[in-house]
Amino acid sequence: MAQIFDELQQIPAGDAQALFECLAAQLKSDKDYHKLFDSRLMQRKYELGLPLVKPASLGDVPEALRKTVEETYITAAREAGELFLAAGDIPAAWMYYQVIREPKPVADAIEALPNTLDHSKVEEILQIALYQGVHPVKGIQLMLKAHGTCSTITAFDQATSNLAPEQRQSCAKAMVRSLYNDLTESVQSSVQKRMAFLPPGGSLRELMSGRDWLFEGGNYHIDVSHLNSVVRFARTIEPPAEEIDLALQLAEYGSQLDSQLQYGGEAPFDDFYAAHVKFFRVLLDKGRADALQYFQDRLDQEPDEQDKPFLAYVLVDLLMRSQQLDPAVTLAAKYLSNINTDARVSFAELCQKAGRIDVWKQVTREQNDLLGYTAAILASPPPPSA
């Protein structure tokens, strides 16, 4: 180590370029990529005549030179991140990529990891992948292996509000597949105790068919609280997706459990599994009209006007997802015109998608919403040319 100090000292005075090249080469050799990052900024500051005491700080950079130093900062951060990834140190790499808002290289590195990691590494990766949203679905897969379903459900519930809809959907798919596989394996084991020569590979639906005895005496084959949560998560999955039918099978299984094992939800999901069977059948276009009527009846029969918007929200969501936009607009105009634009169902966006700007204008006028009415005018198609 002492040799490098001598080498640096022997570089001719005034040859700063050679000095920094020698320094960088040594830091790369030592795999000291944090100091390599600092050295790149020190070099740029030296070239600009700036103080060198705090090489990585931007606080001592005049505004006129800030853009130049920031460009070097980004390049140096990218270099350090790449080197840390090559060394297999994802958390250290993320320190740099996070600052420059380039998550993809880290997401790609996390994607390449096996689903089972050493316990000493998994927590840091989970923090980055799931809680910081770099690769949530891989985070879910890792957590299922490391901590099991219960902890993963809790983590997903905590993280879901910070995830983009596509990320939330991918995580829900992973949860559905995991629980479906576990439940199918458990039910198959129970059936094989009575039918030793049961052929492998049957679906959960096939295994349950004609075997009501599976549920006798309050019997169950998976943690029922896990089943409840995963079926709820599955509502975020958009068709077409194989996982929707898997979720339907989970709901069908749940509907056969003893009533004491069927935990209710908020209306219209108070009859939890029966309602979810209808919900997933709408998405799968299996008896869609009957399934939609179930939710319409729940809305019509609700005595409390304050509770009707949530029931209408579910029905409008299903109508939109099954491309029935005109009835969705009519229902939304009645119950959801004041809904937050951050919600899944936006009244204004629905009107635009359905080509019903006239309804948007009518509702905003009735509400004395000048801003909304102006937006509707601006969104209106131009009149046909004469």
Predicted regions and their residues:
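Long, low-complexity, acidic Ser/Pro- and Gly-enriched intrinsically disordered regions
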Residues: 1-98, 104-105, 110-386
